[in-house]
Amino acid sequence: VESKAKDFTLQYDWCAGSMPPPHHYEYTIRIGPGLEGEIVFHPDYPGLGAPEWTEPFDVAEEPLDALYALVKEQVLSREWVKVEDGTVGGSLEWMSGTADGQHFQVPSRVEEEEALEPVYAAIKALVPEAVWAKLRARREQYERDYDAG
């Protein structure tokens, strides 16, 4: 396995489709430099007094190397073309980062989207299950509090 580049950094954004508050949520996962990661979670539309929760986490070297290899193979090898399909509603995901001295940017809704599925799955898998569980619980509590209003 080739060692990951020293300059490997990545930011992945996921955003739920349009829904009335408090059911919308979005999050950003940042990886690198090195074995550091964090997830920033918005349990509602950002701004307007909605909270923002940040959870740092450690990234294990092996899955990070695997992600780096995937990014080199699946992401750096293509020109990403945004599809203007006019779709309204569904969730969106996009990412940007640096690998091998190359900056890359993948917009939401692109051609060859299926090539990104293993990359996005690997990014989400770097966040420990305990962190996801904590954020899910906080989000459910936020929705209950919102509904209790």
List PLM regions with ranges:
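Short glycine/serine/proline-enriched coil/turn segments at secondary-structure junctions
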Residues: 18-22, 47
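Second-shell loop/turn segments in exported
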Residues: 53-57, 106-109
